[in-house]
């Protein structure tokens, strides 16, 4: 599975209009990744922006309602599902059914429509905040790690620096942007590809004819090159196209783990 957006228009309609139709493994993974990354961006936007400015938002005093995958609490599962669906973009961001949520460890803030889930493989998903609470990044990410969360994914941008700050430094996969399957409601905010707090390519290097160039020097290189991005992750990109792609708000999707 390498193209995140493949068949997006087709399978998003299948999800909404024909839920009984089983999606292929490829489509299912792509739809899941898109839903989770956009939801996390909504949740952690304020925290990430504060971090860019050298600040950190204070964490609110919260308690969780919990449901354990090994012994699901039906009432918590129902409330979590309602919480997940309570946002203005819920029809687009919500991916999981109640039966799927039952198989995860759920953490829902008491009295608020905000929480997160952890799958059996350690994937942190369904991060959402449809409440007035702010400053949840520190609590959510720390609590997720303390309860078995080991990996997550996101669109490159302001979340890169935030997730790195909380220990998700191992970049193990990248899905490059595909304009044909750009997600609905995307805001196309420009991403600074040369800022390490907003891009995995900021300190990327490429060896061309035995000379090592940094990403800034590669800006005009209009050819496919293998570069070493954050954490030494190797990926083939066209640097010139990638600069323009990020400039016009079309970042890649990054998969991280502890």
Segments and roles (model prediction):
Residues 1-16:
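Short acidic, low-complexity intrinsically disordered linear motifs used
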Residues 10, 32-35, 203:
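A detector of low-complexity, intrinsically disordered, Ser/Thr/Gly/Pro/Ala-rich segments
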Residues 20-22:
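Acidic, proline-/serine-/threonine-rich low-complexity intrinsically disordered repeat tracts
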Residues 24-146, 238, 243-246, 250-253:
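Glycine-rich short-loop/terminal segments
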Residues 112, 119-197, 205-226:
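Acyl-donor binding region in acyl/amide transferases
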Residues 203, 214, 221-258:
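Intrinsically disordered, low-complexity, charge-dense segments enriched in Lys/Arg
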């Amino acid at each position: 599975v390498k193209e995140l957006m493949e068949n997006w228009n087709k399978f998003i309609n299948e999800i909404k209009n024909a839920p009984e139709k089983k999606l292929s493994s490829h489509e299912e993974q792509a739809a899941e990744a898109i839903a989770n990354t956009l939801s996390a961006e909504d949740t952690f936007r304020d925290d990430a922006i504060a971090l860019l400015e050298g600040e950190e938002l204070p964490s609110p005093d919260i308690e969780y309602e919990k449901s354990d995958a090994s012994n699901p609490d039906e009432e918590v599962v129902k409330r979590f599902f309602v919480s997940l669906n309570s946002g203005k973009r819920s029809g687009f961001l919500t991916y999981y059914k109640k039966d799927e949520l039952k198989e995860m460890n759920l953490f829902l803030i008491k009295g608020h429509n905000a929480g997160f889930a952890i799958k059996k493989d350690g994937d942190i998903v369904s991060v959402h905040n449809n409440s007035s609470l702010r400053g949840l990044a520190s609590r959510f990410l720390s609590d997720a790690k303390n309860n078995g969360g080991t990996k997550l994914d996101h669109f490159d941008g302001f979340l890169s620096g935030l997730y790195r700050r909380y220990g998700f430094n191992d970049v193990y996969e990248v899905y490059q942007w595909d304009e044909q399957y750009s997600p609905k409601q995307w805001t196309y905010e420009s991403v600074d590809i040369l800022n390490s707090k907003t891009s995995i390519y900021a300190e990327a290097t490429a060896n061309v004819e035995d000379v090592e160039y940094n990403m800034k020097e590669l800006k005009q290189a209009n050819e496919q090159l293998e570069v070493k991005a954050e954490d030494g992750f190797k990926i083939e990109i066209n640097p010139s196209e990638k600069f323009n792609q990020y400039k016009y708000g079309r970042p890649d999707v990054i998969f991280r783990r502890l």
